[in-house]
């Protein structure tokens, strides 16, 4: 019997995955202590910023102190500070200047500029990597590392505003794909830079059709368009086009409305990993194949607060730390981050 030789990547994937699994377990087993440490580091790092001075961070010693001094804000309420950062002012929401702005739409005053700092950027990349490595640690599957991986994302071409690069979060993250994945990554840089989405999807279809695709990742609506174009061109199910496609990674929206459609498009079972990325931070990922739900990332430069959803608009609604939440209750999530968002309501 002829045994298939394993690649170096495949051989190294399992021990690396086990190492990351241990690291994640260390902080996830101690959620309260982990969040307390993050809270203290955030407050300590921002005491000399304009926001920190305005809210007397130097006298904040406990979470109760923070609740008294820092009200919950959405983007519109925080915009007076963000505008100063956008104009190039330093030490406003976080020390120094951000290295990027993630530009998103959807506010009454136009585009939102979400700061990304040198402290927060690594967590956007690390979280996605760790989600895949925990999958390896749990399942033992590593074959996919030998194939091609596609990450459907926005253009990596960035604009500049007062010396700070800005673009879509997915386009910013494209600049941080690890070197060991560069040869496996698709589409090509040139195709990824195509601005027109219709033309981009068509180019991606042409590039990927002859390849050994093993991981496909993206926002479900984008991936659906890609799958439908592949099917239109070949008349085949995705699982038949890409025989070794066995891992689908998705996030950004609720997947349930897409599930039946995707099962039909793919035509066979594939493993999947759900992610919860946002411009404001990478909040969670699915860490177990046999369980629904995601692991909240408590050690990623983000301090979480929660308000019961049905009480959120009440005058006396109570803000809760991770120690006070209950399973099965719907909450509005409030975040403070090492990118300079403070008691920020992301709207989820």
Annotated model-derived regions:
Residues 1-58, 66-73, 80-81, 88, ...:
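Active-site glycine/GP-rich loop and adjacent strand/helix microenvironment
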Residues 55-59, 144-147:
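Short coil/turn segments at secondary-structure boundaries
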Residues 86-102:
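Conserved pre-ATP/AMP-binding loop-to-beta segment of ANL
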Residues 101-115:
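Conserved adenylation A10 loop of the ANL superfamily
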Residues 117-138:
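Conserved structural elements of the adenylate-forming
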Residues 135-179:
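Conserved AMP-binding loop of ANL adenylate-forming enzymes
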